[in-house]
Amino acid sequence: MCRVDRYTSRQVAKDCLPVCLFTCLPTLIRKHLLILTAYTLLALGMSWPLALNFATALPGVEGDAGSFVWALGWMKTALVDLRVNPFQSDYVFYPLGGATQLLWAVSLIAFISIPLQFLFGLIATYNVLYLAATVVTAWGTCLLAEEILSKSTVNGQRSTVQWNPLPPFQTFLLFKFITLHATRLTRPSRLAPLVAGLVFAFAPLRLGYGLSFFNLFNTQLIPLYALFLIRALRDHSRRNAVTAGILLGLNAYIDFQIAAFLVLFTGLYAAYQAIELAVTAAPSQPASARPGSVGGGKLAVVAAVSTAAMIALVSLAVVAPLLGMLAKDFAAEGGNYIRVFPISYSAERSYDLLSFCVPNARSTFFPGTPLKIAGVNAPAKPGDESARSPDHQAFVGYLALALAAYATVRQWKRARFWFFAATLFGLFALGPSLHIFGRDLNIPLPYLALHEIPIVNHIRIPMRYGIIVMLALAILAALAIYDLQKRITHHASRIPLYVLRFALFLLPFLILLEYAALPYPIQRVDIPRVYSDLARVPGDFTVLEIPTFNWRFAALTEMYQAIHGKRILRAYTNRIAPGVAEYFGTRGIPIVVRSLRVLEGAEKGELTADEIAEDKWARDEVVRFYDLRYAVVHPDLLKPAEATAIDAYLRDVLKAHVISDKGTAVAYAIPRAAAASDKVWIDLRENIGQMYAGRGWQFEYPQANWQGKFNYVWTRGAQSEIYFVADRAMARVMKFNARAESPQRVTVWLNDTRVGEITLTDVWQDRHVDLPAHALQAGMNRVRLEYGTALEETIGVTTITIE
């Protein structure tokens, strides 16, 4: 053989190696690899042009997306770099800190992202997980549909045959013919499960959640849980029950709302199974074994109950650590920020009945639909963008709706549960009363009952129940296609078979065409280099981000903390505790709260000369307390006049100077404060005194007054906090002037160490508490005054001294 021939042979063998390896894989693995590849390509297409900007842009619109990037990055920064608790930290809202509630929403996804961030970086990792959520959602729905179709009986008529003895050879031929025909009839459809995956994974509602709500977009465990739930209750399998319980518990680490939806879904499926068990009996079985009989029915019920109990126990065990963190947070914050919203709030965030069948405002295929409904797919008023918001993309698609209707009519026995699920969750999504064409008909709906169920009533937006509607419609679509394929095979003599099959082949593409919102919105993300520079600066200090009083801007700027790893003050979280919100939102703390609130335009007006003078006087005290070292201003997020005013303020008041100016991010270095004495003087009646007061204080305007002699500040709640900075850990004495309306016992804690107890009377006087050195720490310290019960306007305080 010549050299060229040898080279050609080696090259051909090398080129064919991937194909050979693929063909050597087991058939089942090859099948699922092909399915996953197809879904991946479709996910890239339906999110176009994200693939062209994979490392420099995020899918979605201005709003929450940046905060979810922070959640992923913060998990890595907290666990790997800082080695602090990512769920409870004072690296945000410093020094009060608190629960990083946003991280609860995607904690599982954030944990998975850690190794990917080392490989691809933060932005690309977010996009990888974004696409993976769609691919696995589609694949899981495909598996669920396959399970339902493969375990379903063939819907046909029973014929009567006169059986006469046949010779052995004829008997064998007849047996082979019957089994072959039965196999063809019961062969699971390949197209139907694939379409089911498309209907759920690429539904406009789910793609809408991808614009802002990364937690609700991560639906990949929903169909997998439904799959193992059905298997567990059908087969009474412990293994499937444990798997279902794990999946249900893990859903809570993605989003509590999804977990609640699945609990309701489980209740509906269990009720459906119980009713079916009660009314169905198998005539071919002995009476004692029939599901409807006394003996068989009891055994079946006991097995179903034990399976459901196992699912519940396993899921509780999985979610227990997260519930423990919730309980700890509720103890600190009171928990009232996770509250039940008024029914009127939910009514404004409910679907119109026509929302499901009217193309949404982001539709590519139906941009000029003549049917426009205010608040559904059209603005309710000039400038209103609510119709383009994530929750408003409820359109289920005409083809999916037609397939669901067909399955309900032609395959009622197999379709009825999914019809009930779609109907019930659709009714939940309509909210407390029925709306048609934007008009409230005042017809009460089942959501009113949900609003009375504890925990479930914390889901304040009824629209979000629509995600289960799409899952049910996906299964109904699969049942319809499965039935249509059978009927096409039977009636191939009337219409050419290839024409009908081609029509079915077009279905997935037509469905995707109805669902498409192309080009899919993306937002470019440029992480300023200065944040990488700040990450390399040694030490534990605070970076002042500007602006943050607008929640959208806070969601964006907090994303950068995952890069620099330093403390920040204001941040965005999906639920902010009242005490934290009051401290960083409405107090008169110089510079970082009152002044920036005005300079950023969050409060109308201008800083007065007296306020600027007060800021200059308090400058060192504020810088020292928060340990402010750098400020980063984003002029593109501010009005030109605001950016100019903030630049002048930072230079004049904080004596800051620019160290980096890249246009969209201007970084300032803030000179350190002069050394202070060991004595800390806190007058709660002064604006600067509010800086030291954490949770549990009632700052009023005008202030409370004692008999016209002096002002004072009330405590509020079951405990109050005081923060102070110590240069070194040495014993100190805390003295505070206070009185109580009635005798009150107060327990004093220093950094979670109990250091004393005092009793307050109705006489104003100084109380002394020793702060031992072993409980103190260099840097920030927290004193907690614990009252044993929630108080309001019972204890008054004027000044606090620590020396």
Where is each model-derived feature located?
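Perimembrane helix-loop-helix junctions
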Residues: 233, 262-314, 411, 487
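Short hydrophobic alpha-helices at membrane interfaces in multi-pass membrane enzymes
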Residues: 161-162, 169, 188-191, 234-249, ...
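Glycan-recognition and processing domains
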Residues: 674-731, 737-742, 788-803
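Membrane-interface helix-loop-helix junctions at transmembrane boundaries of multi-pass membrane enzymes
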Residues: 285, 289-308, 403-445, 492-493, ...
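Membrane-interface coil-to-helix junctions
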Residues: 42-137, 203-219, 345-387, 433-454
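Extracytoplasmic
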Residues: 341-344, 367, 374, 507-688
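Membrane-embedded helix bundles of polyisoprenyl
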Residues: 39-45, 129-148, 190-276, 311-315, ...
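Transmembrane-helix signature of polytopic, membrane-embedded enzymes
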Residues: 142-153, 158-180, 187-202, 498-508
